[in-house]
Amino acid sequence: MQIRNTFSSLKGEITRFISVSLMIYIITRASISNAYPIFAQQGFENPREATGRIVCANCHLANKPVDIEVPQAVLPDTVFEAVVRIPYDMQLKQVLANGKKGALNVGAVLILPEGFELAPPDRISPEMKEKIGKLSFQTYRPTKKNILVIGPVPGQKYSEITFPILSPNPATNKDAYFLKYPIYVGGNRGRGQIYPDGNKSNNTVYNATSAGIVSKIIRKEKGGYEITITDASNGREVVDIIPPGPELRVSEGQSIKLDQPLTSNPNVGGFGQADAEIVLQDPLRVQGLLFFLASVVLAQIFLVLKKKQFEKVQLSEMNF
């Protein structure tokens, strides 16, 4: 009987441990993952809105620069590089989900024209593979091969990301044409300020939800604060919860207004978007242009030779 009770107790402890571990994993995973472009896949069918705004800006509120470099023109069924640069000060440290400071990660979403897609590994040259490094790109949706996402990846190593792109061939793809196409890119450095569910992360400023007097500040054991604000007119108390990370900017006894910042803004990152244009060039048009240029050069040469010949004839007649 004692052995059976011991076994039942041990079984219960193991079950509770697994349940708690699973809950911690889910909460931690959600708080970390929702801050990068790759996770916009979860809530949006298309990352680019009708207004031209990329949805990553919903969570990354600070505006930062991003740059894209692509060839001016490419031939059909050709692999080329799309280089995305996400610049930032490498000395900066961001607030992590646990409130500690750490290095910034980066992420990007690349929106290509229909028909353009990620180049297969066997079409990528060794030189391009060296530039890509260990990056692993994903399509935004299985049906949207022209939209690629990457991240989060270490910013100190991958502030410049090289995408290997395969251009379409209108001869085999009836939806592709020899035209000029737009390319859009969005890139972020650091964590977001708002999660997709609308809740704030700990990487943003926290404001007072009520006006009044700061009557009590409790520093929590695992970081963060509980700030009690008392309305002087009716004595009503409101408690604002501050997670670990932001630095407190108010003190007990201080009079504050509604929406007044209670903390500093710890965010050092941000999101930016840019665009470029690329021409899918018809090889026959290129050949025609080369033929035209060659004919012009030959015509100039023959004109010079004819002029020289005419001058010689004139000189001989004068001497005669």
Swiss-Prot record:
The keyword DNA-binding does not apply. Its main location: plastid. InterPro entries: Cyt-f_TM, Cyt_f, Cyt_f_lg_dom, Cyt_f_lg_dom_sf, Rudment_hybrid_motif. Binds 1 heme group covalently. GO terms for molecular function: electron transfer activity; heme binding; iron ion binding. It is a single-pass membrane protein. It is found in: Plastid, Chloroplast thylakoid membrane. The keyword Electron transport applies. It comes from the Eukaryota. The chain crosses the membrane at residues 286-306. Heme binds at residues 36, 56, 59-60. GO terms for biological process: photosynthesis. Residues 1-35 form the signal peptide. Pfam families: Apocytochr_F_C, Apocytochr_F_N. Its cofactor is heme. Keywords: Chloroplast, Electron transport, Heme, Iron, Membrane, Metal-binding, Photosynthesis, Plastid, Signal, Thylakoid, Transmembrane, Transmembrane helix, Transport. The 4 large subunits of the cytochrome b6-f complex are cytochrome b6, subunit IV (17 kDa polypeptide, petD), cytochrome f and the Rieske protein, while the 4 small subunits are PetG, PetL, PetM and PetN. The complex functions as a dimer. Component of the cytochrome b6-f complex, which mediates electron transfer between photosystem II (PSII) and photosystem I (PSI), cyclic electron flow around PSI, and state transitions. Belongs to the cytochrome f family. This is Cytochrome f. It comes from Citrus sinensis. The lineage of its organism: Eukaryota, Viridiplantae, Streptophyta, Embryophyta, Tracheophyta.
